Amino acid sequence: MTHRRGEAVALAGLLAAAGVTHFARPGFYDPIVPRALPGPARFWTYASGVAELAVAAAVAHPATRRRGGLAAAALFVAVLPANAQMAWDWRRRRPVKRAVAYGRVPMQAPLIWWALRVARPSR
């Protein structure tokens, strides 16, 4: 397995796992859906889970990997408001939970970088 392919498979696995958890534990995600979004939070929880699964499939397949990587980067940008919402909402929680919530915000930058790296054609 080439290094670039390994990165793509790992990113696809991360996205797929995240997508599955949106369906397995939607109650975790519902409270962090930004309140400015219209409609019920559960809709957005499931919609983001579907998006993560679709993007995972695109990243995993070599023929769609470039578009999948770009879609993954866009998805990581799109979920930034939810991570910011979680950080705000959890600001008074126990230190460990607060650290997790605060850590999700800056973690988006390396995830975006990773997705863009996967999107680049191999040399």
What are the functions of these language-model segments?
Residues 1-123:
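Short amphipathic, positively biased membrane-proximal segments
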